[in-house]
Amino acid sequence: MSKIIGIDLGTTNSAVAVLEGTESKIIANPEGNRTTPSVVSFKNGEIIVGDAAKRQAVTNPDTVISIKSKMGTSEKVSANGKDYTPQEISAMILQYLKGYAEDYLGEKVEKAVITVPAYFNDAQRQATKDAGKIAGLEVERIVNEPTAAALAYGMDKTDKDEKILVFDLGGGTFDVSILELGDGVFDVLATAGDNKLGGDDFDQKIIDYLVEEFKKENGIDLSQDKMALQRLKDAAEKAKKDLSGVTQTQISLPFITAGAAGPLHLEVSLTRAKFDDLTRDLVERTKVPVRRALSDAGLSLSEIDEVILVGGSTRIPAVVEAVKAETGKEPNKSVNPDEVVAMGAAIQGGVITGDVKDVVLLDVTPLSLGIETMGGVFTKLIERNTTIPTSKSQVFSTAADNQPAVDIHVLQGERPMAADNKTLGRFQLTDIPAAPRGIPQIEVTFDIDKNGIVSVKAKDLGTQKEQHIVIKSNDGLSEEEIERMMKDAEANAEADAKRKEEVDLKNEVDQAIFTTEKTIKETEGKGFDTERDAAQAALDELKAAQESGNADDMKAKLEALNEKAQALAVKIYEQAAAAQQAAQGAEGAQSSDSANNDDVVDGEFTEK
């Protein structure tokens, strides 16, 4: 069975891992980094992903960041003169990760396990699956990020029974999961979270502070200047990271804008104490899900054996202190918070292929599922933190006499009224025989698969007629749209490969020209003029082909030059070998003369 890669598709950074033997290994990107910025930019018709895209974010308005926060919505982003869905942008990131994983493995990759925040709803999970499909990946499993982290943490501890709390604060989302580990079983007891809380919010607090300080001093609102705002975003992210290691940092942004008197510069000193003060409310927000998860799991803090920190934002000192204060435990630092989720996803890939034995993952649904009933009430069929996959049925009836059809309004959430929860979909069961209200028996069944994706069916127990739907969010993509996007992604991949081939050829030509010119210059006046002249002629032809830009011509002329340069190199080698032989011969002769004189002794004599 081919390899299944593990992907952590993050808000700010993503990572890809693969199972090698029984070890999960992070695959470095082409720039040598173990995580890749989840950034996509468009320039001159080219799609740029990762570090290169992030570097040009300040100057390129066609740059998309933090697209994960829009997954599962109908919101589109405009770039490159076109509107893109969150699934399309996410697919570009996935395609890039897939590409360099293939380069590392030396084989095609078609299957992946992709992680999502535990608190992602059905629409967001479906959108993630669609993004994988557009990128040319068969998504074998959607795994919750804290669960994947626990899998990576606990793989070498399968003989140990312990309860762990995973505190996962990433770039855009926050999750807390409580798991019980023992005998290779990873059992999620409860999960809670906040999909609108992450490192981006901490950055925004710094940005708002800088905008306010600059406005006080100069009377100019930098939040209205798109380019200045991007520079502020970069500076805020850097300052946040700096303050994890030092207690004060200097934010310097020269020429941030221009005033009546000329260019203006931003210079602000930010202390860790001030940063903690600015972000106090965000840190406070992490405490509620921790308490809720413990309550849902029916555990007290004393029963938790380990606290695992996941996500780059858990490096913020105030966050670490809050975790210590809330749990009464020193967090376990045995895992890399940026890499552990992708590593866990790769392990789950190994479970699917059979390379990892005796590991069972029991995950849960993060939110309750149900339908709208009379009076706009939300009636739950599946409670949150129910182990998945699962199925649950309940019998309902009609609300009016001779009602010919029932509308099934499917919802996800925790609020008592339907209007306050997330609509997953609607469908209708028709042709119900005329009968007084309360008589028809309508059985509604919810199914949640291992990926947390929901399907619902309604069945009239009297006629056995049933209606069935797999929930597709109103904001989701149709099969036709996914198909079109897959074709676009494939076309982009071909175009990218062609561009890479052109760049490789250009580099090869430049290198050949440089090397040959150097050789011709160094061999001037040393003989073998025939070979030198032939190499020079081939060199001139290659330069002309380079000027024309014709790839086929360049390839042919490069081959010809390599042939002539090889002939010249052979002559140089032969001359060098002959010279060395001659030198060795001379040394041998000298040694021989010396040996012949070894027994000769000078003496004096006198005639008598």
UniProtKB/Swiss-Prot annotation:
Protein's recorded name: Chaperone protein DnaK
Source organism superkingdom: Bacteria
Keyword Nucleotide-binding: yes
Pfam families to which the protein is assigned, alphabetical: HSP70
Role description: Acts as a chaperone.
Region Disordered: start-end pairs: 576-608
Entry keyword Oxidoreductase: no
MF GO annotations: ATP binding; ATP-dependent protein folding chaperone; unfolded protein binding
